[in-house]
From Swiss-Prot:
Gene Ontology terms describing biological process: aldehyde metabolic process; central nervous system development; epidermis development; fatty acid metabolic process; hexadecanal metabolic process; peripheral nervous system development; phytol metabolic process; sesquiterpenoid metabolic process
Name of this protein: Aldehyde dehydrogenase family 3 member A2
Enzyme Commission number(s): 1.2.1.3, 1.2.1.94
Subunit relationships: Homodimer.
Amino acid sequence: MELEVRRVRQAFLSGRSRPLRFRLQQLEALRRMVQEREKDILTAIAADLCKSEFNVYSQEVITVLGEIDFMLENLPEWVTAKPVKKNVLTMLDEAYIQPQPLGVVLIIGAWNYPFVLTIQPLIGAIAAGNAVIIKPSELSENTAKILAKLLPQYLDQDLYIVINGGVEETTELLKQRFDHIFYTGNTAVGKIVMEAAAKHLTPVTLELGGKSPCYIDKDCDLDIVCRRITWGKYMNCGQTCIAPDYILCEASLQNQIVWKIKETVKEFYGENIKESPDYERIINLRHFKRILSLLEGQKIAFGGETDEATRYIAPTVLTDVDPKTKVMQEEIFGPILPIVPVKNVDEAINFINEREKPLALYVFSHNHKLIKRMIDETSSGGVTGNDVIMHFTLNSFPFGGVGSSGMGAYHGKHSFDTFSHQRPCLLKSLKREGANKLRYPPNSQSKVDWGKFFLLKRFNKEKLGLLLLTFLGIVAAVLVKAEYY
């Protein structure tokens, strides 16, 4: 591992990842890979998650292509140095912010969307001019293998490498020094990544998860609400970090919600859900058994059917769920949807705030003020009102968590910023040295007073014009005098 990281760092230090033209070429090559090897990519992901190729394309591939196009369109502007506002003492100097690549980045991908959650941060790292080591999840082994095969065929083989393996390989990687680590996965491993990064003072982006609540107000269209929740919850068999984890609603709505979700499930997946090409499977037996354990002692309103041999768990809804039970103590990450009755929106807000900050919050209501209130009085990584998941699709939004649901953000410009150092640059002249006497010893009260005048914004707007004229006269006199020094 050490030799691999050293090799990538030497490639970065050569400087060839920095020019804008090179970055654009690599992004175009990545897009070409996705387009030319689409069939191979679709087949690998489908094998890992029992996904239809249509779902793979719509949930992963199209997002990657859209992100690449967005980067190609905007990158020339983003890499340009940006001038900043100056104060009186620097008004004749050149001041700007220059984005610079961080260096060698480690990206640790996730298994639930193994292509997009690995490639999307890679796009940002390439756009920012970094070298990258990619560590796909070993749980989605087919996707990991296809990435290791294809990426070297299209990208610079010294700057961007794939390292496959399990816990042992990841542990060894984390012992190495990186300039940024980007991890997508669960909170427990996120803490391990952060601890390892701290030894080298390496900054991290942690895309984690949590229990994303979904509040349903009585003032809403339940038919539409339940269709949207059903889509977001059971997509990818519930293995989505921003899936609605549980529902909060008044008790009077509970039976209607159950019935409408049940009917929607039938509409989406047919009478025999197990045979539907649009319904996926749990990634492995360990996660299958973990999810089953969450059903113990619960009231199953519908669903609950399982098949260990194929890792099938039917779309399931639980009612009258006790907040103290196991299913409400950990992220479900599966096709189980608990309903927790609350008296009103006040109790819902308190319920959310008493728990760890989630990755997403969903609120359904015709009452716009109620939605705004829940946004104002809670905290989460992101919010979608009257829908679920959809804020992820807007690449002008930063996507990321807060608190235990993660730190840092990416997508679009936010990815570029995550993998860049915003370097402040001030270029002064060696002339006009007389004007600098104000800051040189020996110090005096008059210098302090002049410093206040130049640097502190204490002007009354009504007197601003007169003060500005006076100030310009003083500056002109100082500059004229300085020319004789």
